[in-house]
Amino acid sequence: MKDKRAELLGKYPVKKLLVKLAIPATAGMMVNALYNLVDTFYVARGAGEVAIGALTFAFPVQMIIMAVGLMIGIGSASVFSRAYGRNDREKMNNVVNTAIRIDAFLSLILAVIGFLFLDQLLTFFGASTSNIEYAKDYLSVILIGLVPLSLSMVLNNLARAEGRVNIAMYAMMLGAGTNILIDPLFIFDEVTFCGTTIPLLGLGVRGAGIATVLSQIISFSYILTKTFSKDSQIRVNFKNWLDIHFETVKDIIVIGMPTFLRNSLGAFLAILILKLISFYAVGDSDIYQSVYGVINKMIVLINYLKQFQT
């Protein structure tokens, strides 16, 4: 299996290899974008249109943590790929260990900051008196899943760098599919099926957050077990968490920084638009912010569809 992947990456025609690697990655991200729309639909039906604002305010926070995960993931994948081409196993393991450690550290720091300053962040984002409680309910849960979310992005990129693109796709699809299935269980009070009323948990927007975090943990568990299976060349030393190679950190960040800037600028743009809505909206701004959140998720899905076509 390892020799087959090495031959694929080293000798396969570039154009065919690009299609073979790109389609699973784009398909997985497209399903991920679609589930975000479904998540919004469930929240609107179960908690009302004002509650969609909770997902809207969570978007910049998730974008920033995704920017960190992509920075570490893409940077480490590039360094790993070069070591993979040289068959430098020591460097490969060094990159993986360093990437996981710094990503876990950075995402944990961001999650702690989010918990400590949640009220201040939401006020700064422009949350109104109508939707700030919804946003607090949702984000207080979502912050728990930031570390596995960010680590999943790192492991997804490393799996692709090793030529195991299907594993990354399955991980994203597993997380999205799980979220779509369990969202109603946590959000709705009850559901009627074949004339029978079935009681559910009825946690509203907090339930949407719980379902999202659980799906992220399931996706992370899958990619974790597959990434470090016997068929993989990726190995992690879990004993010494302070064993970080700063030269490797520099290489990873230099390569991944443009990706971080691009995604974090998207988060800051979302914050700016939310603040403008709260300032200029006629009457309560909560509905306008919810509409912006829905449009934003549709734009993300359309962008992935465009990537799939190209």
What are these regions (language model features)?
Residues A27, D39-V43, L55, F80, ...:
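Hydrophobic/aromatic residues within transmembrane alpha-helices of membrane transport systems
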Residues L34-G53, L122-T129, I187-G195, P199-L203, ...:
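Helix-terminus/linker motif at the lipid-water interface of multi-pass membrane proteins
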Residues K16-A77, S81, V254-S278:
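Signature of the first transmembrane helix
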Residues I52-V112, L149-A168, L274, Q289-T310:
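Small-residue-rich hydrophobic transmembrane alpha-helices
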Residues N179-D183, F220-L224, L301-Y304:
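Hydrophobic transmembrane alpha-helices of multi-pass small-molecule transporters
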Residues M1-A22, F80-V147, C194-M257:
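Short alpha-helical transmembrane segments in multi-pass integral membrane proteins
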Residues D103, A159-L185, R206, I210-V213, ...:
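Alpha-helical transmembrane segments of multi-pass membrane transporters/permeases
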Residues A25, A33, P60-M63, T98, ...:
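Residue-level recognition of pore/gate-forming positions within transmembrane alpha-helices
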